[in-house]
Amino acid sequence: MQFTLEPFMNSFLPAGANRVDAILTVTAVGAGVMADKPQAVVGLILDISGSMQGQRMEAAKHATRKAIELIDPSAQFFVIAFSNHVWRVAAPAPATPQNKALAQAAVQRLEAGGGTVISQAMHQARTEFQQLPGALHYALFLTDGKNDTADEDYLTQELAACEGVFQCDCRGVGTDWQTKQLQKIATKLLGTAQIIAEPSSMEADFRAAIQNAMGRAVGNVRLRLWTPKSAKILSCKQMSPEIVELTNRAKPVDAQSFDYPTGAWGAESRDYHVAFQLMTGEIGDEMLACRAAIVYQNAGQEVKISAPPLVATWTEDETLTSRINAQVAHYTGQEELAAAIQQGLEAREKGDMDSATRFLGRAAKLATESGNDETTRRLSKVVDIVDANQGTVRLKSAVNKADEMDLDLGSSRTARAARKPNLDA
């Protein structure tokens, strides 16, 4: 696996300005040569509470058995089931045909019943993963209901303990679960949160998730930002393929360097938005804002891939200072789009239809302007888009709950910015 790190920014500041915004594009290509490619460990975590009875339970068992088939023979795997208790359905074991068959048989015997206590399932998953250190730890979590209210504080504590131990993709089947609960887990554990509206779609979703996990080759990759004493980091966010707030997850390396977690990587590309505050310079001054690098371990040695330094220059030339970097502008718009959707859905839930129409109209306009067709498609199931260019929409009188939840969860997914070859484009 080979990484590249490319910065995009307008490096020219007018007199008195002290903020620099940069987009850092990180790309990993090819399998590359990894001296000790880590083993993968896959955990499947299934909700078997009473609400899963019937079609959902049968679809979940079928999808899980199919997912087990897809796990690479070089990996290890385990299966956990939970309701208001937790069960080790299949202990961690190599993904041999025999072990897969035993696990599939155990999954088929599962029966639904009881409540929903997610913290116990996360604790058990963490325990299993910690038995196999140094591996790529991935979990696929499925639920169909709301977590027990009494468990929320325990879940928050457990997720803090799970952070950095494993990544987790979350799936909600049906519409009786809460999007914010799934997002809470996925965000903390660097995963995705998606709805499976119909049980019949579960197998295809599980298949895609497992195939994606099996394509990862490098784990615990960090974005390292070094700043001089004349600069400080204001924020750091992943912007593509979806928005993930990383600012408060920085780990100090030394007095001037911080690592931001990015998880495991396959062949892919992601964009990060970093904002800096500098000591204000004089016209003609140049100041280093940051040295950025991607850092990971290979054969016990730290590998570091550095970007060109991010340097700011103060100038009186308005043709230079008035430029808005295309990458920065694009992702600023994508962040505004996500916020508009959230504000619109919240207003709609409160019965403030005028505000909901205004916010979702703004979202339709931003989605169209940025070419975010996926978000436009989701919006069109909640509003009638009368004139996207003007942001004119009408709220639909009847909205499928699954479509509303899909728009909520999908609001953080962004359209990729067009690539530009230099810092000042």
Predicted regions and their residues:
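Exposed acidic/Ser/Thr-rich ligand/metal-binding surfaces
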Residues: 4-220, 279-282
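Beta-strand elements of well-folded, non-transmembrane domains
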Residues: 9, 26-30, 48, 227-229, ...
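Broad gene-expression machinery/nucleic-acid interaction feature
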Residues: 19-21, 39-41, 220-222, 271-273, ...
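Surface-exposed loop/edge segments in extracytoplasmic proteins
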Residues: 90, 232-235, 301-305
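Acidic, polar loop-rich interaction surfaces within structured domains
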Residues: 158-167, 179-297
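Long, acidic serine/threonine- and proline-rich intrinsically disordered regions
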Residues: 278-425
